[in-house]
UniProtKB/Swiss-Prot annotation:
The gene is arcA. Its main location: cytoplasm. It is found in: Cytoplasm. Its EC number is 3.5.3.6. It comes from Borrelia garinii subsp. bavariensis (strain ATCC BAA-2496 / DSM 23469 / PBi). HAMAP family: Arg_deiminase. The keyword Hydrolase applies. This is Arginine deiminase. Coiled coil: none annotated. One of its GO terms (biological process) is arginine catabolic process to ornithine. Keywords: Arginine metabolism, Cytoplasm, Hydrolase.
Amino acid sequence: MEGYLNPINIFSEIGRLKKVLLHRPGEELENLTPFIMKKFLFDDIPYLEVARQEHEVFASTLKNNSVEIEYVEDLVSEVLASSVALKDKFISQFILEAEIKTDSTINILKDYFSNLTIDNMVSKMISGIVSKELKNYVSSLDDLVNSASLFIIDPMPNVLFTRDPFASIGNGITINKMSNKVRHRETIFAEYIFKYHPIYKKNVPIWFNRWEESSLEGGDEFVLSKDILVIGISERTEAESVEKLAISLFKNKTSFNTILAFKIPKNRAYMHLDTVFTQIDYSVFTSFTSDDMYFSIYALTYNSSSSKIHVKEEKARLRDVLSFYLGRKIDIIKCAGGDLIHGAREQWNDGANILAIAPGEVIAYSRNHVTNKLFEENGIKVYRIPSSELSRGRGGPRCMSMPLVREDI
């Protein structure tokens, strides 16, 4: 992007958004059934036609605010179109990571993918493949035992949530180790984009890689300033990963000198930190707390002389911890004002999962009307988007977007 030396430039959660990564909802949502949706981390089945309409409103809202949009499927297709050898390598890796065991099935799939246009191939990899789509396919015992019901290759409906497979931090990224097996293949796309795409293969250091043993997901990664990160320890991100990321950032002499680890309960409703906590203005955050939702906070700093990380538990309240490290008074708007009924309802429907597109300007689901009204009463400009279908995947505007470039603040 013109005006930036690096293709990744993220030093805040709220700087004016210039470039973002999305995924267009596709046929993968049509391959969800009541019998398998829990396995694929969905609580209900979205209606694709309406989900697409809602997502287009989201994309249009971004474009109307001068945000450039990249689509993950387009970037991967551009990479694979550059080299037949690279395309073949990608196909082989994708099939391997789909855990196809028998040579006959592997060869059938290689032929099938190779004969599709690149755009259609990427689309089919995301949407999944059932046996009736392949000529000459005969399932082996091993394929049947390791297959999910009808699928030779499982769908990847969570690609919709581009926030999680990788995260932009400073001028670099983390390519994440996903917590759930059904999401592991999503990070292949990030691997190829940042290894081979002409825009992204240079000047983008990788702080954490997808082959790590412990899990890390983008919904738990927050860049509060050029000095401070917040990382959630949650249902999806492990404490070991926070320390690994801290070591990587500190030893590479980045600008980040403090990582605040926010431990939250391991609970489906609070799968990532960004389901209960986001920044919406310079000094304003939104959060959700309840009897079973609370924050334990730890500060990680680096002693360069001993090359060791120092960990300190913070005993103060969330607001006071943020005020201390950011050096200014902080206000926290509780989801639905802390109302026991509306707060729980709106948190479940991503009332705290807000995407800031500029300081004090956010995109939010229209259904969370109590929280949105509170934002506006506190001077926040809210762009409302419809979400009757998108919200069925338990992800809001922040989950559905990965910022690539923000203006520095």
